Amino acid sequence: MSATDLASLEKTIEAAFDNRDNVNMSTKGEVRDAVEAALNLLDEGKARVAERGADGVWTVNQWLKKAVLLSFRLNDMQVVKGGSGNSTWWDKVPSKFENWGENQFRASGFRAVPNCVVRRSAYIAPNAILMPSFVNLGAYVGEGTMVDTWATVGSCAQIGKHVHLSGGVGIGGVLEPMQAGPTIIEDNCFIGARSEVVEGCIIREGSVLGMGVYIGKSTKIVDRATGEVMYGEVPPYSVVVAGSMASANATMANGLPAPHLYCAVIVKRVDEQTRSKTGINELLRD
């Protein structure tokens, strides 16, 4: 699709979103066609909710998020087939794999293990592996990435190339508020089991999160070497574990020591060469 066509599509969706109270299941024509076209672009990886520039800055294509939201107003509930024992579901969003056969799976180039769930408009790149997991609409999963068992990739989340999302990992989805950016895991990251990254936070390239690390916008991310405290973004090639910090007030009103509060701790930073040659377990050793 040309830049002119994309601009026209964006204009139509922006206008429809501004007038969304009048968009419903009976809406036909240009608006419905534009939303369908946008969802197809997302589904095929030809457009992304967020894109990383050469300077490392992520730009959010809000109009694509708006297209996803408009689709809920346009589409009725329907039976979704494919459940265990010929059971069905009841939803507005069909499976990405609806009506797929061998040819479509071979062309896609990724592995989809039984009981993984991918909703339409999520893109899965070649050589990715989906264990029994959940990938929500508008998400992007990069080439060679492993989405392990019971991991969840939220709506519009952006997962880079050669990422490992370990068992039970949760990557938060962000559709609303509209101005919020999606949660982003950049290339070559390892996210340890049962960790959570939410609220539009960014884990920069090559970083390693140990098991059970929770990062949201209000989570303190502390560099142990410098004492620097940051929020919302883990720097490139950081090794991060769960920790705690002393409270600002050393004691409570009753005189007892104040409880320490959770934080994420950067225990070390490594360069790209070290990261590529060093095992994950070795990096996480103190």
Curated annotation (Swiss-Prot):
Pfam families: Hexapep_2, THDPS_N_2. The keyword Oxidoreductase does not apply. It is an enzyme of class 2 (transferase). GO terms for biological process: diaminopimelate biosynthetic process; lysine biosynthetic process via diaminopimelate. It catalyses: (S)-2,3,4,5-tetrahydrodipicolinate + succinyl-CoA + H2O = (S)-2-succinylamino-6-oxoheptanedioate + CoA. CDD domains: LbH_THP_succinylT. It comes from the Bacteria. GO terms for cellular component: cytoplasm. InterPro entries: DapD_Trfase_Hexpep_rpt_fam (IPR005664), Hexapep (IPR001451), Hexapep_transf_CS (IPR018357), THP_succinylTrfase_dom1 (IPR023180), THP_succinylTrfase_N_sf (IPR037133), Trans_hexapeptide_repeat (IPR050179), Trimer_LpxA-like_sf (IPR011004). Pathway: Amino-acid biosynthesis; L-lysine biosynthesis via DAP pathway; LL-2,6-diaminopimelate from (S)-tetrahydrodipicolinate (succinylase route): step 1/3. Its EC number is 2.3.1.117. Keywords: Acyltransferase, Amino-acid biosynthesis, Cytoplasm, Diaminopimelate biosynthesis, Lysine biosynthesis, Repeat, Transferase. Homotrimer. This is 2,3,4,5-tetrahydropyridine-2,6-dicarboxylate N-succinyltransferase. It comes from Rhizobium etli (strain ATCC 51251 / DSM 11541 / JCM 21823 / NBRC 15573 / CFN 42).
